[in-house]
Amino acid sequence: MMRSVLASAARTTCARSTRLLRAQFSTSKHTGAPGSLYSLSEEEAMMRDMVTQFARTTVQPKVLSMDEQEKMDPSIIRGLFDAGLMGIETPADFGGAEASFTSAILAIEELARIDPSVSVLCDVHNTLVNTVFRTYASRELQEEYLPKLATNKLGCFCLSEAGAGSDAFALQTRARRDGDEYVLDGTKMWITNSAEADVFLVFATVDPALGYRGITCFVVDRSMGVKVAKKERKLGIRASSTCQVEFDSVRVPASNVVGEVGRGYKIAIEILNEGRVGIAAQMVGLAQGAFDCAMPYLFQRKQFGSRVGDFQAMQHQYAQIAVDIEAARLLTYNAARLKEEQRPFAKQAAMAKLYASQVAERASSRAVEWMGGLGFTRELPLEKFYRDCKIGAIYEGTSNIQLQTIAKILAKEYQD
């Protein structure tokens, strides 16, 4: 009897697994027959090639000086706007490129191969800030802000606080209604792009008693009284500004509420899935950049009469890293395509970010080792890649949060 019950349960489990796989890999009406994840449209290929050229000619000469000064060169930000890289998915009517999400992911990856700091500036602006406006903001806010964000105004995403990191909705920043305005009071921490930003997306609670249902998203201009305070001195991505942002009775028009009052938590949850794919792309680009920097050296340097890259122990190492980078890239591209097809992608986004950040650590660490003492110096970008990679396991959801997200979705899939 028990054997029969177990067999029946096993058949049910197998059938459920088959349905899950079919749902995940079924042909989408948007794409026709399935093809390689490397299959890019003409526009996507052009975007990738253009960004590759921009990164090499405009960004690369300034990477080391920006890292040493811990400051983004203003000419780089202007260059990103001039190249059309700050409104990649923004509709043409608002001055954007009206390109695909994959185009944005390709741009983030290619920038990260040269400098992850520039990459994350572009990433946060596109995948978080612009997407919030495109998806949730009123037509009036879109008309006012999207053209600026596509052409000359940098944005930032103000969610984290000193006591609200992984527990993102334990917010203390308050928004009090006063006539046709809200008055914001509180302090945000770890805000990327904040030193240079003109537009701040701020998450605050209108009523702490409501818990997460009181959280609301506001559009706040720097000119409204935002104070960008302490700038963090960081291990890596030093040219990317990370600051404390203070709101001391900052008055914001009620019309600057994004979406509905009390729906900010929904915006944050949904938008961070896209942001995680962006961070995965950044980590893939970083890993590839470190790999590309170290590999030629293995076939130039000789020890014991042989090229270092010809020793079998070394061959196994760089072959494994190449596999890891390829797998991380495919996870990232798959998550991007699922998002474009309007299919569930939260699990795949978490997987991509988790794995890509792990691969970036392994690849950059190995690359430093492969180049020996030279890799440990500041004359090459390898030690910078090694420092830059660590943030991938921390921001936009720590690795433990990604694992928790994946496990939660898997448990639901196998219990439903």
Where are these regions (language model features)?
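Alpha-helical interface subdomain recognition
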Residues: R3-V124, Y136-L141, K148, N152, ...
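Flexible, glycine-rich active-site loops centered on histidine and acidic residues
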Residues: N130-Y136, F157
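A short, Trp-centered hydrophobic/proline-enriched beta-strand micro-motif
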Residues: T151-S160
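Conserved hydrophobic/aromatic beta-strand scaffold that supports enzyme active sites
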Residues: C156, A170-R174, E181, V199-F203, ...
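Short Gly/Pro-enriched turn/cap motifs at secondary-structure boundaries
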Residues: G163-S166, W190-N193, D207-A209, K234-S241
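Flexible, small-/acidic-enriched active-site or ligand-binding loops
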Residues: A170-Q172, S223-P253
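A short core secondary-structure module
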Residues: E181, D185-K227
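Long, acidic (Asp/Glu-rich), low-complexity accessory segments flanking structured domains
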Residues: S249-I267
